[in-house]
């Protein structure tokens, strides 16, 4: 059956700031306390969506979350009106204010793990929300992510959206950033590759930085998504590269159809994994980048592998890269050699995503891949699909509500909270989502 990969990109939120919240993510730590530009960040993301849509790659948008997230501050013991809560936390414990104001939901590669209908036992598309258990600021995302996905994939005959796994370290799940799918045409059954960093009873694990994904979580997600057990492989990421800042697999590998583009040090027991994939995926091609050409350190600093690998109708592929790759002489030299070599990659598209990159999120972090048949695509909420009208409407919306300068101190401004709620109220109408945010459901309006 014919099917297409639709990229659902996260829209950067109004409180995008640099707080260094993500230990193990070296870009996040390095840019801590810099001044951010939320308006520019949102526009950089929108431009990527629009240019890819114009190039023929189906594209949609997932909205940001409500931030600062006052309900969690109340759970932490701050009381009074919303304004009083903000004032108290800013004075007494500003680190909590930064955490509940994080715009991290924009990295929707961590929103959920997807199983296309061709891979599932019941023939539905399955989406399991990630619990993002390893980082407090990200663990707050799951309930609203679930509401948003249910508003976008709202036809229960075609889509099953599952709640996140329990919030315990044993079941730490980071979503599609640790998941690849390999195979032929998108509509054919594919091989799902789940990548984990640690498992109970296995001493092979990183020592410097945390392994965020567990094998136990990956196995549970595969069960929830009803993936045919014959179409699943579980593989461990190389713990040494996690200790070098590869906090998700999508920082060291990316797949599309029959191609796996990865660093030669990406996986534990890599040669064994690739042999398994060759045996189980027709036409499988591994493009392994040698450390002699691109070091792990350079891969992390340029986000070479946090790229998007997209298929054209003729079978050729486009690699979507951040500008940092072009600015690194060694990485750019390698990429031009890759273009000239015998493989399906025939074009490089480069985007300026500096605002997101400075927090450790490249092109692949910003998108959630969902393979859909034509019938399934028609069942998606049409208001989120990117086109000229939506692009212009969202740019106008960003111009109206977003600030062009934000520091950690600005997060205590009650006006920022009001602006954010008014903006999201408007956005839910624009995207025909209904009341998906807690402040809307509580009848709090814009106050």
From Swiss-Prot:
Family designation: Belongs to the succinylarginine dihydrolase family.
Record: active site: 174, 248, 365 (nucleophile)
Pathway stated in the Swiss-Prot or TrEMBL entry: Amino-acid degradation; L-arginine degradation via AST pathway; L-glutamate and succinate from L-arginine: step 2/5
Keyword annotations of the record: Arginine metabolism, Hydrolase
Function comment: Catalyzes the hydrolysis of N(2)-succinylarginine into N(2)-succinylornithine, ammonia and CO(2).
Database matches in HAMAP family: AstB (MF_01172)
Single Gene Ontology MF annotation: N-succinylarginine dihydrolase activity
Catalytic activity: N(2)-succinyl-L-arginine + 2 H2O + 2 H(+) = N(2)-succinyl-L-ornithine + 2 NH4(+) + CO2
EC number(s) recorded for this UniProt protein: 3.5.3.23
Record-linked SUPFAM superfamilies: Pentein
Record text on subunit structure and interactions: Homodimer.
The protein, known as: N-succinylarginine dihydrolase
């Amino acid at each position: 059956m014919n099917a297409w990969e639709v990229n659902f990109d996260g829209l950067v939120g109004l409180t995008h700031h640099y707080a260094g919240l993500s230990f193990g993510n070296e870009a996040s730590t390095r840019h801590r306390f810099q001044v951010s530009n939320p308006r520019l960040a949102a526009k950089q993301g929108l431009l990527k969506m629009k240019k890819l849509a114009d190039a023929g790659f189906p594209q949609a948008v997932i909205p940001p979350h409500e931030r600062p997230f006052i309900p969690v501050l109340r759970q932490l013991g701050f009381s009074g009106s919303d304004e009083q809560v903000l004032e108290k936390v800013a004075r007494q414990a500003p680190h909590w204010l930064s955490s509940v104001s994080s715009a991290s939901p924009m990295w929707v590669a961590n929103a959920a793990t997807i199983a296309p209908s061709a891979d599932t036992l019941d023939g539905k598309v399955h989406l399991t929300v990630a619990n993002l258990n390893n980082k407090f600021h990200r663990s707050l995302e799951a309930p609203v992510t679930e509401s948003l996905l249910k508003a976008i994939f709202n036809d229960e005959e075609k889509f099953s959206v599952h709640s996140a796994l329990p919030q315990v370290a044993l079941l730490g799940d980071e979503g599609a950033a640790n998941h690849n799918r390999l195979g032929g045409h998108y509509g054919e059954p594919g091989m799902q590759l789940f990548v984990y960093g640690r498992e109970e009873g296995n001493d092979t694990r990183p020592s410097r930085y945390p392994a965020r994904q567990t094998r136990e979580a990956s196995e549970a997600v595969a069960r929830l998504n009803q993936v045919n057990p014959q179409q699943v492989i579980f593989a461990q990421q190389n713990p040494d590269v996690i200790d070098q800042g590869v906090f998700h697999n999508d920082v060291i590998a990316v797949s599309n159809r029959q191609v796996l583009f990865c660093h030669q040090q990406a996986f534990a027991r890599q040669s064994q994994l690739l042999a398994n994939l060759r045996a189980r995926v027709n036409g499988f091609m591994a493009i392994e980048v040698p450390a002699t050409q691109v070091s792990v350190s350079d891969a992390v600093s340029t986000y070479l592998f946090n790229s998007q690998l997209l298929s054209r109708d003729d079978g050729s592929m486009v690699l979507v890269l951040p500008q940092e790759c072009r600015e690194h002489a060694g990485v750019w030299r390698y990429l031009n050699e890759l273009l000239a070599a015998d493989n399906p990659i025939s074009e490089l598209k480069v985007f300026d995503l500096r605002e997101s990159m400075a927090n450790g999120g490249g092109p692949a972090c910003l998108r959630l891949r969902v393979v859909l048949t034509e019938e399934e695509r028609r069942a998606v909420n049409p208001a989120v699909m990117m086109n000229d009208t939506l692009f212009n409407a969202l740019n106008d919306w960003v111009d109206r509500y977003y600030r062009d300068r934000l520091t950690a101190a600005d997060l205590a401004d009650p006006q920022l909270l009001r602006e954010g709620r008014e903006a999201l109220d408007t956005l839910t109408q624009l995207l025909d989502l209904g009341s998906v945010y807690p402040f809307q459901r509580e009848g709090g309006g814009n106050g």
